[in-house]
Each structure stands twice: as structure tokens, then as C-alpha cells.
């Protein structure tokens, strides 16, 4: 991957440094995200479904309510319920009423969901090494720090 430069995106007027940086982030996200989607496709998952499974794995046995899952998504979407429906139909998640608060329904990852993630952990680690392995540790740390700083406004 090469950095996005002004000359790659012909415009009538020059881009501001902020616009050039934003465009670079968007193009890079599209490239990396497309490659992730291609890796997940043979495993029957979309990137958002994979993200939900990772979120639920991180939640442990307690699981999470629908709105908590939605708050943690990389790309929040309006229909977390439908996402959870699909994952539950595939046997990768299960939902049950919260015994402490019967108004709440908690989603949990199933053993099949954990097994699917275990299959994918190595696959995606290898992909991320192919995507960004050409950057050294100091560059990766700097990139991570800059992206985190860009999210804080």
C-alpha cells in the first residue's frame, strides 16, 4: 500500500492537509476492509458478524444486551437484532433472558461460535501481517497512536 497523495486524486482545487489525510484513511480502510471481507467469506461470515462474535467472546459468560453489542461495533448499524438473529440461526450465538433483569435479553457466544473464531484467529492474524507487516514496530505504534488521536475530537 502506498500513501494517498494529492496527485492520486485529481481535483480542481488542492486538498487541505486534513482532507488529504481523511481521504487516505478512508481509502486505506476500504482496502483493508475489503481484504478482511474476502478472507471471511469462505467461513460464512461478514466482517460485522465477525465483529459481533469477537465482542461476545470478549464479554465472557455474562454476555451482552443488544444495545451493548451495538455500542461496541466497529461500524455501528441500526439492526443489531437482525445480526444476532442470523448468528443465532447459525448456532454461533444464543440469547436468553437475564435472570437479574427479566426485561433484558443477553446474547452469548456458543461453543460453535468460539470454534469458528478459533479457526479465524490465525487466518486474520496472517492477513494483518500481509497487510501491514511491511511497517516496522515503531511505524505501527505511530500509526495506531495517530489513528487514536484522530478519533478524539
Locate predicted features:
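Charged, amphipathic alpha-helical coiled-coil/dimerization segments
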Residues: 4, 85-148
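N-terminal leader segment of winged-helix/HTH proteins
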Residues: 1-43, 90
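Short, charged, intrinsically disordered terminal tails
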Residues: 65, 151-153
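Short amphipathic alpha-helical segments with heptad-repeat character
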Residues: 22, 26, 30, 74, ...
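N-terminal helix-turn-helix DNA-binding core of bacterial DNA-binding proteins
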Residues: 30, 34-76
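Pre-recognition alpha-helix immediately N-terminal to the DNA-recognition helix
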Residues: 20, 24, 31, 35, ...
Amino acid at each position: 500500500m502506498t500513501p494517498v497523495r494529492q496527485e492520486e486524486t485529481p481535483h480542481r482545487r488542492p486538498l487541505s492537509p486534513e482532507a488529504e489525510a481523511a481521504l487516505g484513511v478512508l481509502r486505506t480502510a476500504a482496502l483493508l476492509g475489503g481484504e478482511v471481507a474476502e478472507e471471511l467469506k469462505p467461513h460464512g461470515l461478514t466482517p460485522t458478524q465477525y465483529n459481533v462474535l469477537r465482542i461476545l467472546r470478549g464479554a465472557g459468560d455474562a454476555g451482552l444486551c443488544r444495545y451493548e453489542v451495538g455500542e461496541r461495533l466497529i461500524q455501528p448499524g441500526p439492526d443489531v437484532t437482525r445480526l444476532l438473529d442470523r448468528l443465532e440461526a447459525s448456532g454461533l450465538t444464543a440469547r436468553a433472558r437475564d435472570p437479574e433483569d427479566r426485561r433484558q435479553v443477553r446474547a452469548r457466544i456458543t461453543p460453535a461460535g468460539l470454534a469458528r473464531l478459533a479457526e479465524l484467529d490465525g487466518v486474520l492474524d496472517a492477513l494483518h501481517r500481509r497487510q501491514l507487516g511491511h511497517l516496522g514496530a515503531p511505524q505501527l505504534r505511530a500509526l495506531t497512536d495517530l489513528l487514536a488521536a484522530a478519533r478524539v475530537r
